[in-house]
Swiss-Prot record:
Domain of life: Eukaryota
Gene (UniProt): atnK
Function description: Part of the gene cluster that mediates the biosynthesis of aspercryptins, linear lipopeptides built from six amino acids including 2 highly unusual and nonproteogenic amino acids, 2-amino-octanoic acid (2aoa) and 2-amino-dodecanol (2adol). The core structure of aspercryptins is as follows: Ser/Ala-Thr-Ile/Val-2aoa-Asn-2adol. The first step of aspercryptin biosynthesis is the generation of the fatty acid precursors, octanoic and dodecanoic acids, by the FAS subunits atnF and atnM. The fatty acid precursors are likely transformed into the corresponding alpha-amino fatty acids in three steps.
Effects seen without this gene: Decreases the production of aspercryptin by more than 80% but increases the titer of aspercryptin with Ile replaced by Val more than six-fold.
Descriptive protein name: Aspercryptin biosynthesis cluster protein K
Amino acid sequence: MINQTAMLLTRSLRPRSAFVGAGLGYPRRFLTTVESPLHEFFVVIFNKRNAKESDLAPAPQTIKFKEQDVILTFAGDMMASAAPATDSAPERTLGACFRVPGTQRAESVAGDSRPREHRQGAVGY
């Protein structure tokens, strides 16, 4: 189920007409919001260098990756932690650890080039 969600999420990471933050001073092309088709997580990905400071919301939990201008923000029943990605992971790979609602286990989503049946999930942009 996690693999299927990750693949669908990857396919849905394309520009949309209605972006979170539109009208708050964020350049629309640098802000993307994606909700998983199975509704177990929600992410916002944006380019930090092009986002203006805003006092409208409290600081979210974030995960910082190799590319320091990218932030992954969780909302809802989430647990943000460092991804289990290694130095050999492809550049511009996002990784995250999140709690699946209704369970006590944490699931990982990280860049992985292994065959689908051997990986935890791959999310890229």
